[in-house]
Amino acid sequence: MFFDPETWVAIAFVILMVVFGYLGVFKSAMTALDHRAARIKAELDDATRLKQEAAKVLADYKARSATAEREAADIIANAKVEAERIATEAKAKMEDFVARRTKTAESKIALAEAQAVADVRAAAAEAAVQAASTILSQSVKGQVADDLLAKSISEVRQKLN
């Protein structure tokens, strides 16, 4: 049994482990593994912190987006109300403008009609005066004719004007 290769391998393994223990290989290996574990733990902590920050940023973005959408909807609704109000005002102003223009046109027409009637009356009076003066001057002569002519012309003018 002492000459079996398994025995010598086992003895060499034990001696190697003792030498490693004496040299501190196990301690340095454990230290390296501890450092690596600490580095991995720090990376995991950073990843967790970054994930939480990303979740906060996402929640903030969603809240701001919802707020912006509500504000946009309010702005659109206010713009529609304002547009309707402006359209109503414009319609009322246009109707008022048309009514005033119509009234102005009607008064100008009435004034033109009155002027035309006055012009026609004046022309008729002139024609009547001319006709009366022609008839009277042919039928009556002298001072009586002149007095009668002046009196009739003034009466005709008073009645026609």
UniProtKB/Swiss-Prot annotation:
<keyword id="KW-0066">ATP synthesis</keyword>
<dbReference type="Pfam" id="PF00430">
    <property type="entry name" value="ATP-synt_B"/>
</dbReference>
<keyword id="KW-0813">Transport</keyword>
<keyword id="KW-1133">Transmembrane helix</keyword>
<dbReference type="GO" id="GO:0005886">
    <property type="term" value="C:plasma membrane"/>
</dbReference>
<keyword id="KW-1003">Cell membrane</keyword>
<protein>
    <recommendedName>
        <fullName>ATP synthase subunit b 1</fullName>
    </recommendedName>
</protein>
<keyword id="KW-0375">Hydrogen ion transport</keyword>
<keyword id="KW-0812">Transmembrane</keyword>
<keyword id="KW-0997">Cell inner membrane</keyword>
<dbReference type="InterPro" id="IPR050059">
    <property type="entry name" value="ATP_synthase_B_chain"/>
</dbReference>
<dbReference type="InterPro" id="IPR002146">
    <property type="entry name" value="ATP_synth_b/b'su_bac/chlpt"/>
</dbReference>
<keyword id="KW-0406">Ion transport</keyword>
<comment type="function">
    <text>F(1)F(0) ATP synthase produces ATP from ADP in the presence of a proton or sodium gradient. F-type ATPases consist of two structural domains, F(1) containing the extramembraneous catalytic core and F(0) containing the membrane proton channel, linked together by a central stalk and a peripheral stalk. During catalysis, ATP synthesis in the catalytic domain of F(1) is coupled via a rotary mechanism of the central stalk subunits to proton translocation.</text>
</comment>
<keyword id="KW-0138">CF(0)</keyword>
<dbReference type="GO" id="GO:0045259">
    <property type="term" value="C:proton-transporting ATP synthase complex"/>
</dbReference>
<keyword id="KW-0472">Membrane</keyword>
<comment type="subunit">
    <text>F-type ATPases have 2 components, F(1) - the catalytic core - and F(0) - the membrane proton channel. F(1) has five subunits: alpha(3), beta(3), gamma(1), delta(1), epsilon(1). F(0) has three main subunits: a(1), b(2) and c(10-14). The alpha and beta chains form an alternating ring which encloses part of the gamma chain. F(1) is attached to F(0) by a central stalk formed by the gamma and epsilon chains, while a peripheral stalk is formed by the delta and b chains.</text>
</comment>
<comment type="function">
    <text>Component of the F(0) channel, it forms part of the peripheral stalk, linking F(1) to F(0).</text>
</comment>
<dbReference type="GO" id="GO:0046933">
    <property type="term" value="F:proton-transporting ATP synthase activity, rotational mechanism"/>
</dbReference>
<comment type="similarity">
    <text>Belongs to the ATPase B chain family.</text>
</comment>
<feature type="transmembrane region" description="Helical">
    <location>
        <begin position="6"/>
        <end position="26"/>
    </location>
</feature>
